[in-house]
């Protein structure tokens, strides 16, 4: 059956309980992309570049040809935020024009009501507010550190800001895998929490996953139409429209990662 039904109802495959869904959200979603951003998307180019393979480092940068790497990586981190908060939020790079340095912490950045009642954040905060605080702090710190890399990333691979962003993302990844997942298993593994976990899984699917992919589908339809229009009527204007829509379509794609 469809993913939404399988995940919410735990009817087949790896999802045999509400807890298995929460584990999937933490490890396969949140940890996986935090680790990928820190250990691959930033570290791979950095390692190649600083070892002397400058061309290899350049070509290892994701989206280097569009100068969109920083926003792609930041949207990856915002996908973790959406998963943890149980809600898609409009506090993204376009809203603040990439100026995350204007915010001292997530407390300045977040709006009231950003965190859904049925969310991982609310659940963890109910028993361990310090851990919830650490997670929220590192999510925002990772996004802020990425945006602090001088633009474009391809020209600043070996900058101290790149190293800081890489390390912060890896700190977030380590927290999610080595502290958050074990804590959730130990604290909420009893069947008495099944209803709470099930509500979080449903909120995640209905308010994060499905809207993200709906947005992705709609924006890719517009992109395809623009590409076909350029193919049929080549012009600078039609080429620019297709390029801009490609950039627009990347946002929900990168925000789908967690």
Predicted segment positions?
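Mature extracytoplasmic or organellar-lumen-exposed domains after removal of signal/transit peptides
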Residues: 1-258
């Amino acid at each position: 059956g469809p993913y939404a039904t399988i995940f919410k109802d735990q009817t087949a495959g790896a999802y045999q309980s509400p807890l298995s869904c929460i584990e999937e959200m933490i490890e396969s979603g949140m940890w996986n992309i935090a680790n990928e951003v820190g250990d691959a998307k930033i570290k791979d180019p950095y390692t190649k570049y600083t070892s002397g393979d400058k061309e290899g480092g350049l070509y290892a940068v994701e989206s280097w040809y569009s100068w969109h790497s920083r926003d792609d990586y930041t949207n990856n981190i915002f996908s973790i935020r959406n998963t943890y908060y149980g809600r898609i939020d409009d506090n993204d790079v376009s809203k603040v024009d990439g100026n995350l340095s204007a915010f001292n912490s997530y407390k300045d950045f977040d709006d009231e009501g950003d965190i859904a009642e049925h969310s991982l954040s609310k659940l963890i905060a109910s028993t361990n507010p310090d851990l919830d605080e650490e997670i929220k702090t590192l999510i925002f710190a990772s996004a802020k550190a990425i945006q602090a890399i001088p633009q474009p990333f391809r020209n600043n691979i070996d900058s101290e800001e790149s190293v800081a962003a890489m390390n912060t993302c890896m700190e977030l990844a380590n927290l999610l895998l080595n502290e958050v997942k074990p804590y959730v298993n130990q604290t909420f593994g009893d069947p008495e929490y099944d209803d709470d976990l099930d509500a979080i899984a449903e909120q995640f699917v209905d308010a994060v996953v499905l809207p993200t992919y709906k947005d992705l589908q709609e924006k890719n339809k517009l992109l395809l139409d623009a590409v076909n229009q350029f193919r049929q009527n080549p012009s600078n204007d039609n080429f620019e429209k297709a390029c801009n829509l490609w950039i627009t379509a990347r946002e929900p794609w990168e925000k789908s990662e967690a």
